[in-house]
Amino acid sequence: MGVLRVYVILILVGFCVQIVVVNSQNLTCNSNDLKALEGFMRGLESSIDGWKWNESSSFSSNCCDWVGISCKSSVSLGLDDVNESGRVVELELGRRKLSGKLSESVAKLDQLKVLNLTHNSLSGSIAASLLNLSNLEVLDLSSNDFSGLFPSLINLPSLRVLNVYENSFHGLIPASLCNNLPRIREIDLAMNYFDGSIPVGIGNCSSVEYLGLASNNLSGSIPQELFQLSNLSVLALQNNRLSGALSSKLGKLSNLGRLDISSNKFSGKIPDVFLELNKLWYFSAQSNLFNGEMPRSLSNSRSISLLSLRNNTLSGQIYLNCSAMTNLTSLDLASNSFSGSIPSNLPNCLRLKTINFAKIKFIAQIPESFKNFQSLTSLSFSNSSIQNISSALEILQHCQNLKTLVLTLNFQKEELPSVPSLQFKNLKVLIIASCQLRGTVPQWLSNSPSLQLLDLSWNQLSGTIPPWLGSLNSLFYLDLSNNTFIGEIPHSLTSLQSLVSKENAVEEPSPDFPFFKKKNTNAGGLQYNQPSSFPPMIDLSYNSLNGSIWPEFGDLRQLHVLNLKNNNLSGNIPANLSGMTSLEVLDLSHNNLSGNIPPSLVKLSFLSTFSVAYNKLSGPIPTGVQFQTFPNSSFEGNQGLCGEHASPCHITDQSPHGSAVKSKKNIRKIVAVAVGTGLGTVFLLTVTLLIILRTTSRGEVDPEKKADADEIELGSRSVVLFHNKDSNNELSLDDILKSTSSFNQANIIGCGGFGLVYKATLPDGTKVAIKRLSGDTGQMDREFQAEVETLSRAQHPNLVHLLGYCNYKNDKLLIYSYMDNGSLDYWLHEKVDGPPSLDWKTRLRIARGAAEGLAYLHQSCEPHILHRDIKSSNILLSDTFVAHLADFGLARLILPYDTHVTTDLVGTLGYIPPEYGQASVATYKGDVYSFGVVLLELLTGRRPMDVCKPRGSRDLISWVLQMKTEKRESEIFDPFIYDKDHAEEMLLVLEIACRCLGENPKTRPTTQQLVSWLENIDVSS
């Protein structure tokens, strides 16, 4: 009987559930909700898939079935509704590729509980009415492009989640934020542009568990009221400008599990309160100004898993109680002032996997106890004064799980051990650079089949490069530069599997600390945050290698950098090198190479740095988009080369003797050819005459063909001028040729990204710059004309104006206004004589002008224009040093040689944003990234990248960011312009530059924000 009752109950429950489901599916929108959704839809730039939009009849009324919408009946919500309509309670439209504005009509959805629009491209401001929805529980607008001030009048009594992470809100965080949020659990305002201090009223959010304020411009100290948030489990304050001491009241946050205060300006001692924080598993305080010893409570924390105190001024001995710290997995204490020996008890921290002790002066050896360090996977002792490399390697080989080992700048002038019994079976990354080590490449490395990255550069290693390196199938980065290796390049290196195809690509190890490479007393270091940041590279430069360059190098399609500079290589440059389709840098300079430069190299569409200087090459220099951008220095020291970067090429006259002999041998062939040609010509003329007579007799003339012919004839002789009010003031191609001496090399004033630029003085005395776009532009004449006319309409005081265009042979000529002071690149990097370089006021004015020009292209010009190649050489200066952007929009006029390279990917190494490596679509935020690099050039006076340099900072961005985290900003700035009077202004510009360089495009500012920020910087007199 009991069983029967259960069955009856189950049947009834199932029946009721079915009724509820049926009723839910049949619900239709309340008329007010329907209008609100219509208003929301009209604010978007495109329709939503799954929404039944009908222009003629408005919406389909059955909106409760639409994608992303959940409804409840008005009765179930306790509403008095005789029609029992469906009320919208959830709007879940995250990751729907939405763009446009968030309509204020959404605020009319008065029963809405969840509004989730995360990861779209919505923009504009947030209406204050949206923050007065009394039933709203979740508001997630994260990862969009919303901007403006955040509304200060907030009345959301039911709200549990407020997430506006990764937008562009600015101004103060509203002081009243927490006044009417009694149920709030999560507040995430990170990755915006909020400034000022953390409001005192934050303490009123008594129920909050997650508080994210990271990556803003917040300053001042942490308000004491924040430490009243006893429910707080996550506090994220990193990447701001917060300062002052860290209060001991921190211990009141007893539920805190994650605390990140890194990259701020906190100072003083770290409070000794960690025994009270017995749930804290993540603590990062790196890149602050903390001093004193590590708190004992921190060294005895049973809960800590990740501990990062890198880049402070902490002192004393490193002490960790591994008996207590049973959960510790990652330890980063690098760049501090600790003293004493390496803690020998660390292997007793049984879960510890990654250790970074870089830049700590131990002056000691690696403890014998490390043989028992079985949990260790990543270890860095870079620049830590470690001694006895033989002992170190013998001990560390016993760490069976070790995958990453960095020992740079230690063991000075010791000998790299060659004991064949050494084994590192799981090692993936080995960096022992800048140690002046003696010896050879040790055979024991062949016992590391998983090796992906090997850097033994800047040592004194000798002998030959072993062929077995080519059998390391995972190796994608090999740097043996600046040693004394001899012999041929092993042929086996041309078959490295990880460089042949993407199918053989390997997953990079990801330790929790940065790598520092090639750092010694002569130059700053180059930082890589992950092994995957290293470009696929073979660098054998600055050795004594001989023999030829293997043609099979062309099989390495994934290789980005091939540097064979400063060796004794001979023979020809193989044409097969054009197969390295991903190559960005090719340096073969300072060798004994002969023959010509293979024309096939023009197919290397990504090639940004190229040098064959100081060899024995001859013949014409290839022409093409990439080769026209390389400086003359790339080809100097080769007397036999000719072309646009060297002396003009001429047809060599044969000697009289040789000519006479050839003439006697071929006289019969010449007579035969002449007779045959004559007869053929007579025949063709006869046929042509008959066709003309036949056509004329019929009176047939194709007007369209005649118009095309006339247009081509006109285009080849005349110059189309824009904005020319004087119709009598015409310009002909003859005028252009005369003004440039038929494009004589002496008139070249620049090598732009799309062709050579010539200076010309027109018959009326006007100076102009003429850009010669060589080769096929990939467009018909009419398409080209339409594009050029569009560009000519871009008129702004900070743009180089396009004055006209014409055809010349197979080339297109663009005529621009002339800028007397040349490029910013010249003034920052090339000017060596005359008056001093640009002062700070001028540099700031140039930055402002360039920003205004870019903002015009992005926001005011119709149609909007992406520049795609912002760099210092594309910022030209007038006689009064007013900045003018050049080369905007030219990417649409040029098609590269390879079809796999789109016009969107045009750019210059050092300026290309990181996301362009994964996508083929250029964006406005990509231009902003490149502008950030230019700001760094203005601040530092340094080029963004010079991969071919054997020393120095190759990557300006990495160097600046590292110096910034170490609070060494004053060392970043160009000494010519840096002084205390301008320090604050320069720091502000540096902050703007770093904003532009954010890895996530959505976190970068708009160009209008750039203009506003730069204009608000007051220049000291």
Swiss-Prot record:
* Functional summary from the UniProt entry: Phytosulfokine receptor with a serine/threonine-protein kinase activity. Regulates, in response to phytosulfokine binding, a signaling cascade involved in plant cell differentiation, organogenesis and somatic embryogenesis.
LRR repeat intervals: 21-43, 85-109, 110-133, 135-156, 158-180, 181-205, 206-229, 231-252, 253-277, 301-325, 326-349, 351-372, 373-397, 402-426, 428-448, 449-474, 476-496, 498-555, 556-580, 581-604, 606-629
- Which reaction is the catalytic activity of this chain? L-seryl-[protein] + ATP = O-phospho-L-seryl-[protein] + ADP + H(+); L-threonyl-[protein] + ATP = O-phospho-L-threonyl-[protein] + ADP + H(+)
Q: Which organism is it from?
A: Daucus carota
Q: Where is the Protein kinase domain?
A: 743-1014
The record's family statement is: Belongs to the protein kinase superfamily. Ser/Thr protein kinase family.
Relay the record's extra comment: The 36 amino-acid island present in the 18th leucine-rich repeat contains a ligand binding pocket that directly interacts with PSK. An island domain has also been found among the extracellular LRRs of the brassinosteroid receptor BRI1 and has been shown to be critical for its function.
Record key words, sorted: ATP-binding, Cell membrane, Glycoprotein, Kinase, Leucine-rich repeat, Membrane, Nucleotide-binding, Receptor, Repeat, Serine/threonine-protein kinase, Signal, Transferase, Transmembrane, Transmembrane helix
Signal peptide region: 1-24
Biological processes, Gene Ontology terms = defense response; response to other organism
Principal cellular location given in the protein's record:
membrane
Q: Which GO terms describe its cellular component?
A: plasma membrane
Residues bound to ATP: I749, G750, C751, G752, G753, F754, G755, L756, V757, K771
Where in or outside the cell it occurs: the entry states:
Cell membrane
Classification via InterPro entries: Kinase-like_dom_sf, Leu-rich_rpt, Leu-rich_rpt_typical-subtyp, LRR_dom_sf, LRR_R13L4/SHOC2-like, Plant_RL_S/T_kinase, Prot_kinase_dom, Protein_kinase_ATP_BS
Q: Where are the bilayer-spanning segments? A: 673-693
| Glycosylation (residues) | 26, 54, 83, 116, 132, 204, 217, 231, 311, 321, 327, 383, 388, 482, 546, 568, 576, 592, 632
**What modifications does the entry list under PTM / processing?**
N-glycosylated.
List its EC numbers.
2.7.11.1
Gene Ontology terms, MF aspect: ATP binding; protein serine kinase activity; protein serine/threonine kinase activity
**Coiled coil start-end:** none
Q: What is this protein called?
A: Phytosulfokine receptor 1
User: Which residues are named in the active-site annotation?
Assistant: D869
Q: In which tissues is it expressed?
A: Expressed ubiquitously in leaf, apical meristem, hypocotyl and root.
Origin: domain of life: Eukaryota
Q: Which Pfam families match?
A: LRR_1, LRR_14, LRR_8, Pkinase
